[in-house]
């Protein structure tokens, strides 16, 4: 009696073959009562598949591997040996490694990949109820307590009790305005220079500009003109006196 695995192998070969020109039409595959006839039929179907396999007009390394390769198991073996647990595929089980078992990539060559030294230890913040858990790990002076001191941080309720409800609301609105407004870089010296120093002082209006240089210019021009006029008047007076002296000398002679 034939094993069901052999019959299943023959059925798989017949299904892969297609509708037209099946290998079952061969007289060797009509009588499957013996094991020899069954093996001959399987070999015939295999040879028919290899001869009629499509040939791709591409390079050799891009073509699909033929079923006659050494790495593919023979078709006449039982299907129980084709399972992944069979010893025919030992390398695939060794090469298949779960992604969880792979080591994570640590970017140690970047300065933010792995902190060095004491930077690895996170800063722990303790409340009043959790201080007893790690009292031995950290000394008392290194702990940061999150205490709520009413003297340092007055609550809004105290302000409302004293009639300062408007002040509390103004503080809330001021915070909201800071969030909604544009960010001003006041801590940089180029954020908002005074108007007198913007663009070297050339973009100021006429009223904003200092008028001292203009007044000094007018004053210098007036003084210079006055000096020139006085010199001219002095020369004219000298010429007149000289002319009068010549006339007196002429009349006396």
From Swiss-Prot:
Valine amide, modified sites: 116
Protein keywords: Acetylation, Amidation, Cleavage on pair of basic residues, Disulfide bond, Endorphin, Hormone, Pyrrolidone carboxylic acid, Secreted, Signal
Modified residues (N-acetylserine): 104
Cross-referenced InterPro entries: Mcrtin_ACTH_cent (IPR013531), Melanocortin_N (IPR013593), Opioid_neuropept (IPR013532), PMOC (IPR001941), POMC-derived_peptides (IPR050878)
Post-translational modification, as annotated: Specific enzymatic cleavages at paired basic residues yield the different active peptides. Acetylation of beta-endorphin occurs in a tissue-specific manner.
Disulfide bonds: 23-45, 29-41
GO cellular component term, pick one: extracellular region
Any single GO BP term: neuropeptide signaling pathway
Residues in the signal sequence: 1-21
Tissue expression pattern: C-terminal peptide 1 and C-terminal peptide 2 are detected in the anterior part of the nucleus lateralis tuberis of hypothalamus, in dorsal hypothalamus, thalamus, telencephalon, optic tectum and medulla oblongata (at protein level). Expressed in pituitary and hypothalamus of adult diploid animals, and hypothalamus of triploid and ovulated female trout.
Pyrrolidone carboxylic acid: residues carrying this PTM: 22
Recorded family membership: Belongs to the POMC family.
Function: Melanocyte-stimulating hormone alpha: Anorexigenic peptide. Increases the pigmentation of skin by increasing melanin production in melanocytes. Melanocyte-stimulating hormone beta: Increases the pigmentation of skin by increasing melanin production in melanocytes.
Name of the molecule in the record: Pro-opiomelanocortin A
The organism of origin for this protein: Oncorhynchus mykiss
Gene: pomca
């Amino acid at each position: 009696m034939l094993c069901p695995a052999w019959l299943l192998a023959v059925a798989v070969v017949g299904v892969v073959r297609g509708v037209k020109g099946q290998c079952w039409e061969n007289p060797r595959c009509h009588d499957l009562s013996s094991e020899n006839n069954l093996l001959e039929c399987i070999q015939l179907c295999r040879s028919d598949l290899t001869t009629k396999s499509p040939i791709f007009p591409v390079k050799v390394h891009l073509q699909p591997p033929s079923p006659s390769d050494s790495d593919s198991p023979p078709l006449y073996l039982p299907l129980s040996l084709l399972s992944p647990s069979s010893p025919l595929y030992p390398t695939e089980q060794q090469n298949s490694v779960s992604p969880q078992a792979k080591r994570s990539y640590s970017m140690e060559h970047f300065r933010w990949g792995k902190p060095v030294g004491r930077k690895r230890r996170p800063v722990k913040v303790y409340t009043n109820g959790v201080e007893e858990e790690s009292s031995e790990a950290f000394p008392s002076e290194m702990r940061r307590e999150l205490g709520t001191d009413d003297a340092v941080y007055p609550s809004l309720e105290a302000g409302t009790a004293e009639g300062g409800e408007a002040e509390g609301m103004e503080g809330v609105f001021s915070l909201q305005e800071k969030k909604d407004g544009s960010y001003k870089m006041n801590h940089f010296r180029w954020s908002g220079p005074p108007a007198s120093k913007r663009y070297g002082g050339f973009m100021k209006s006429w009223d904003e500009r200092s008028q001292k240089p203009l007044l000094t210019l007018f004053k210098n021009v007036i003084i210079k003109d006055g000096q020139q006029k006085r010199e001219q008047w002095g020369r004219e007076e000298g010429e007149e006196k000289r002319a009068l002296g010549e006339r007196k000398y002429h009349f006396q002679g």
